[in-house]
Regions:
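Aromatic-acidic/polar surface patches that form glycan- and anion
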Residues: 9-16, 62-66, 117, 122, ...
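GT-A fold catalytic core of metal-dependent nucleotide-sugar glycosyltransferases
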Residues: 65-116
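N-terminal anchoring/stem segment of glycosyltransferases
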Residues: 1-59, 78-79, 188-201, 206-211
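Short loop/helix-cap segments at secondary-structure boundaries that form the rim of catalytic
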Residues: 41-49, 98-102, 180-182
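A short, conserved beta-to-alpha structural element at the edge of catalytic cores
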Residues: 106-126, 130-133
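Amphipathic alpha-helical segments that form well-ordered structural scaffolds
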Residues: 22-26, 72, 155-162
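Short, solvent-exposed loop/turn segments at secondary-structure junctions
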Residues: 9-11, 39-42, 90-92, 114-116, ...
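Catalytic core and acceptor-binding pocket of nucleotide-sugar-dependent glycosyltransferases
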Residues: 126-208
Length: 211
């Protein structure tokens, strides 16, 4: 059973490193494997309990960094494996059980935008891959467009497109909250620049950083 994040070196240092530490600190389970894919690493400060993959890529853009994790997941994990993918700018706030993890990852579970008329109603901040063909469909549809031509929101455009083919379950509040911390939630994510650049939100995340 697996949790995957992907980012560049800057985002790893600023966000992903603390996310991975927080997950392991609260959930040092032998059944849970943590994975991090880093694009263009430079002096990577690795954690012993994390499985790392890296790549060198000349055309790094925000859209590429947003979508590459789903391409990595399709290559790395077999369809029957239980996989959760998170935004790097998240933090773990409580323990979860193996049964809870299996339950949420058995289906394609996705973070839902709180606004009904949002351009992207399904958000990539929290995605579980289910145990069927979703991960392959997602990666293949992302790659129909050459990676250096990906535009902002490409990952969520494809996520929306596939909602007609795969039945998504809305990520429950018990697993993920966005911006404002909820004591019930396993993860808090700062999805969006509005939250990442506002101390009102970042200070909530900092409370869970493991020193």
């Amino acid at each position: 059973m697996h949790i995957l994040v992907a980012c560049d070196q800057n985002y790893y240092d600023k966000w992903a490193y603390n996310l991975l530490k927080s997950i392991h600190d609260l959930n040092p389970h032998d059944w849970l494997q943590l994975h991090c894919h880093v694009v263009n690493p430079d002096k990577l400060n690795k954690l012993d309990y994390v499985d790392y993959t890296t790549e060198q890529y000349d055309y790094v853009t925000i859209p590429y960094l947003q979508g590459v994790r789903f391409v990595v997941a399709a290559k790395k994990f077999k369809n029957k494996e239980h996989v959760m993918i998170l935004d790097a700018d998240s933090i773990c706030t409580r323990e979860f059980t193996k049964e809870e993890f299996i339950n949420v990852t058995s289906d394609v579970t996705v973070l839902k935008h709180h606004k009904k008329n949002a351009v992207h109603p399904w958000l990539c901040g929290f995605v579980t891959l289910g145990t069927e063909l979703f991960r392959q469909d997602y990666a293949n549809n992302l790659l129909i467009t050459k990676t250096h031509k990906w535009e902002y929101g490409h990952d969520q455009d494809i996520l929306l497109l596939l909602s007609n083919l795969h039945q998504y379950k809305e990520a429950p509040q018990e697993w993920i909250c966005m911006g404002k911390q909820n004591p019930k939630s396993v993860f808090l994510t700062l999805k969006g620049d509005k939250h990442k650049n506002n101390p009102k939100y970042t200070d909530q995340l900092k409370r869970y950083i493991v020193q």
